[in-house]
Amino acid sequence: MSKIFDLVVIGAGSGGLEAGWNAATLYKKRVAVIDVQTHHGPPHYAALGGTCVNVGCVPKKLMVTGAQYMDHLRESAGFGWEFDGSSVKANWKKLIAAKNEAVLDINKSYEGMFNDTEGLDFFLGWGSLESKNVVVVRETADPKSAVKERLQADHILLATGSWPQMPAIPGVEHCISSNEAFYLPEPPRRVLTVGGGFISVEFAGIFNAYKPPGGKVTLCYRNNLILRGFDETIREEVTKQLTANGIEIMTNENPAKVSLNTDGSKHVTFESGKTLDVDVVMMAIGRIPRTNDLQLGNVGVKLTPKGGVQVDEFSRTNVPNIYAIGDITDRLMLTPVAINEGAALVDTVFGNKPRKTDHTRVASAVFSIPPIGTCGLIEEVAAKEFEKVAVYMSSFTPLMHNISGSKYKKFVAKIVTNHSDGTVLGVHLLGDGAPEIIQAVGVCLRLNAKISDFYNTIGVHPTSAEELCSMRTPSYYYLKGEKMETLPESSL
């Protein structure tokens, strides 16, 4: 016999939990949330809290924080700190254990939320669509496996997130994804991270800090410059600093196959014919919407050409009572975006307050070493959308690095504006503190701040952030898509 709910949510990630909690607490609806695992780790990895909590933002940020201490220890000598000769070494096992405990605490807090919230129920298993109003919960992902529960609902929300993409090459079974990287029993001595995106760059920094003596971190990317889609100046500077930190970056290289050596290490053959022997190959070539186990075909839910669930601006699918939010829609794969989408959906469906998520001017960060903060348009995109664009840029050595021994660690700040009216279209930062600074910048962009608002604001001294309040003269311009040092008088 079916259990009846107002809302059934498949997926207990950030967006699904936000939607379920809000529906139950704000609008007193009866809500069911389904997921395959309560606590983090193998075999399914994404448990209560979703990718972010279990195999994404949270554990990654903890591990990056740990990795930064390598430089802090080295740089402390410039500030008068001396060590008596006793060894300092990284303890990977201790890091992973501490990370696991922190993530488990969050898992348990969500368990408590379900136990303590009236009208909010959790079901363990694999949720899939039987009809447009019925969700079945099965023992496994196999659609022929035993049915544990049958849930009837007026509204169904798909929020199963995304999954690491693995390439179709021989020997891919010898490689890991970022999921497994969070649970490696030992730090790899020789590691190859494949991909030029933020996940590959972030893990390269983590592995580089914790590698055993004599270790080597290599990052390969199929194109000529990592971090496609980010500001080009920052991409170039990140490459310089990663290289200065000892990471080898192989551009225009892509693995063709991976085989095992007799000692268990991996032999990577690239499309160019080059080879590399490493202990771990981590694939980080992107993430794909996790739709394959939902049985969407049973009700005809449409997908986008890239495999995401097709939705409108209110997160509605083509089936009237079925919705989708978060990574599964392949709109903007960021945790705060999924949370906002979940809250907006519940307000729309149950609160009679139609609301949609604004996917523009969303601040985000890359927790690489050095870190990146970005919000709004990069200059190439702005130049296509606006006739006249002015770019303000500054690159400098932060005060601390004048004595830290790391003068190569430049801070880069760039402001992209519509030169016709001064509106700030994008801000891009590289260096210590960039992720923290960019959050406040995001508020400015949402308020349609102008460049004059920035330079007329008194900065906090001495900080890197004050540079945003110091740039009064454009570094260069774009006119009808063409880059130039100065604008012709006729266009002024």
UniProtKB/Swiss-Prot annotation:
GO terms for cellular component: cytosol; mitochondrion. Its EC number is 1.8.1.12. It catalyses: trypanothione + NADP(+) = trypanothione disulfide + NADPH + H(+). Its main location: cytoplasm. Keywords: Cytoplasm, Disulfide bond, FAD, Flavoprotein, NADP, Oxidoreductase, Redox-active center. The active site is at residue 461. Trypanothione is the parasite analog of glutathione; this enzyme is the equivalent of glutathione reductase. The active site is a redox-active disulfide bond. Belongs to the class-I pyridine nucleotide-disulfide oxidoreductase family. GO terms for molecular function: flavin adenine dinucleotide binding; glutathione-disulfide reductase (NADPH) activity; trypanothione-disulfide reductase (NADPH) activity. FAD binds at residues 35-52. Its cofactor is FAD. Pfam families: Pyr_redox_2, Pyr_redox_dim. This is Trypanothione reductase. Binds 1 FAD per subunit. It is found in: Cytoplasm. Disulfide bonds join 52-57. SUPFAM superfamilies: FAD/NAD(P)-binding domain (SSF51905), FAD/NAD-linked reductases, dimerisation (C-terminal) domain (SSF55424), Nucleotide-binding domain (SSF51971). Homodimer. GO terms for biological process: cell redox homeostasis; cellular response to oxidative stress; glutathione metabolic process.
